[in-house]
Structure formats: structure tokens, C-alpha cells
């Protein structure tokens, strides 16, 4: 049972005891992370695992109860996860942050940690070069929009398995007090997308210009796939279409083989462009439960 409200000194002692236990667990967690890092090195796995991070946060949100805000819980764990990536390897972020739109910096900081090395760049090309040249592990760029005259994503199309691709969508856990100039963002980096249970996949379809958007979308739908975003860029006699698909659909999925076959020679190439774990919804972030019912001397919640 909690102390009575009139016993402030005992309540503070209770909080201090909880803080000590939380701190002890953080120390223990860092010790386990060091062993995980060694295991990843032996298995030649990347320290940065965005899919795993999303699964951790979703699991905690699902089990959460009490008055502590879910959005704050997510932010705390984002800081902790960012710190543990730093414990495992070098990690830096390149951010598109033009003078007139600083909101992307806030999104990057909130997701990748306030103590993670971050560099601001005034052009999208600089961000892409920082990632492709290895000066940054991740680059944060604006969400693609339909009708762009020179979309940044067309510069990253490659068959190379090690080429940078989309790894996350920001914000994952709500915008908080981040500046609202600029819409959401996509993060690009190297690595293989991991299935998390709630995913989006991006593919780029290079085709002749005489194949219509409607035909592409009808073909996708006929295969039982759901397109959640579509943008195209035309150049000379060819077009590149960025297609976002609901769910985890790797480039080797038989349905994408059928997509290639149905479009035939009109489809020149179908390239993977990464994907991301679906961010938490506003409804999930607003979730709350009952109040505090115990402290460190009993069953602690909150």
C-alpha cells in the first residue's frame, strides 16, 4: 500500500527507492547490451535494428497501465534505445534541415536521441551523400509527395543489396513539442527490413511511360496487395513509380513475381526500396489505464 498523502517524507522515500531500482535495472540492461553487441559482431549483424526497436516499444505500450503518459514512455525508451546503439557501434545521423524548415531536426532528435551525433544539411543531396559515403548511419529526409519535379528517392534506386534504403518513418511515437514545419519524414540507411507485424514496404517500378498509373494499381490490387502511397517521376520515355504496400512484402514475394509477369515488357525493373514499422497511432498514444496502486515496498505501477 502507498503511504497516506499527508506523509510526504515517506512518499518521497518511496519514489527514491523506485528510482534506485530503475537505475539498477538500467545498469544491468547496459551489461546485457554489451553481450548482445558481441553476439551481433560474431553473427555479422548490424548494431542498429529498427524493426526490433519497434517491437520493443509496441510490446511495452501493449502492457502499459496507469496514469503515466504513453507518449512519454515511448520517448524515454527511444532515448534508451538510442543510447544502447551507441554502446554497440558508431552511429550518426544526417538531417535535412533547411533554414526555413527545422522540424526535421526535431523529429530526428526525438527518434534517434538527444545525445546522438547529428549533422544538419541544407540540401537533400548532402544528406544522401553523407549516408552513401558512410559519414552518417542514417539520413532523415522529407516524406515523398506526389507531383514532385525532382523527387529525392529516384537518386537512391539501385540493385546493390548494400545501397541505402528506407528504414523508418518519423515520428514513430508522436510529434510531441517538435516544430510542425514540414510533414513527417523517412529515414534512410543500410540494412535488411525486419518483419514486425505492422509494416509498410516500398518498391520502385521502372516502366515505360505508356503504362498507366491505373493499370499498375489495378494489377497490385488483383494480387491481393494494398497500395498505401504512389508517386511517379517521368524522364524521357521511361517512368519510375514509388509504390508503398501494406504489410511485409519482400521483393522475393511470389505476388511481386506475378506483378512483373502481368506487366510484361512494359516493366523494366522492380527494385526494393526498404520499408518501415508502422508508427503508433494517436489513439494508442492517448491510451491510459488506472491510477498508481503500489510502490517499491509492494507492487509498483507507474
Regions from the language model: what does each represent?
Residues 1-302:
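Domain-level signature for soluble enzymes in the chorismate/prephenate branch of the shikimate pathway
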Amino acid at each position: 500500500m502507498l503511504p497516506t498523502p499527508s506523509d510526504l517524507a515517506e512518499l518521497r522515500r518511496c519514489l527514491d527507492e523506485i528510482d534506485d531500482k530503475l537505475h539498477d535495472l538500467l545498469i544491468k540492461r547496459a551489461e546485457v547490451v554489451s553481450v548482445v553487441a558481441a553476439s551481433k559482431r560474431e553473427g555479422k549483424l548490424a548494431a542498429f535494428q529498427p524493426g526490433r526497436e519497434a517491437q520493443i516499444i509496441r510490446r511495452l505500450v501493449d502492457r502499459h497501465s496507469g496514469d503515466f503518459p504513453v507518449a512519454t514512455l515511448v520517448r524515454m525508451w527511444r532515448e534508451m534505445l538510442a543510447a544502447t546503439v551507441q554502446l554497440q557501434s558508431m552511429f550518426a545521423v544526417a538531417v535535412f534541415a533547411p533554414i526555413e524548415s527545422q522540424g526535421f531536426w526535431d523529429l530526428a532528435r526525438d527518434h534517434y536521441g538527444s545525445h546522438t551525433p547529428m549533422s544538419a544539411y541544407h540540401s537533400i543531396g548532402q544528406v544522401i551523400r553523407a549516408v552513401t559515403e558512410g559519414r552518417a548511419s542514417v539520413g532523415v529526409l522529407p516524406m515523398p509527395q506526389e507531383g514532385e519535379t525532382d523527387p529525392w528517392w529516384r537518386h537512391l534506386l539501385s540493385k546493390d543489396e548494400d545501397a541505402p534504403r528506407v528504414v523508418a518513418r518519423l515520428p514513430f511515437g508522436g510529434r510531441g513539442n517538435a516544430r510542425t514545419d514540414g510533414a513527417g519524414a523517412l529515414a534512410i540507411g543500410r540494412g535488411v527490413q525486419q518483419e514486425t507485424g505492422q509494416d509498410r514496404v516500398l518498391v520502385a517500378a521502372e516502366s515505360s511511360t505508356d503504362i498507366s498509373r491505373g493499370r499498375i494499381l489495378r494489377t497490385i490490387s488483383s494480387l491481393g496487395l494494398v497500395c498505401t502511397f504512389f508517386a511517379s517521376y517521368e524522364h524521357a520515355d521511361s517512368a519510375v513509380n514509388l509504390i508503398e504496400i501494406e504489410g511485409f512484402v519482400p521483393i522475393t514475394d511470389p505476388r511481386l513475381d506475378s506483378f512483373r509477369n502481368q506487366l510484361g515488357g512494359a516493366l523494366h525493373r522492380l527494385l526494393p526500396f526498404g520499408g518501415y514499422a508502422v508508427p503508433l497511432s494517436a489513439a494508442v498514444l492517448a491510451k491510459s489505464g488506472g491510477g498508481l496502486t503500489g510502490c517499491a515496498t509492494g507492487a509498483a505501477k507507474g
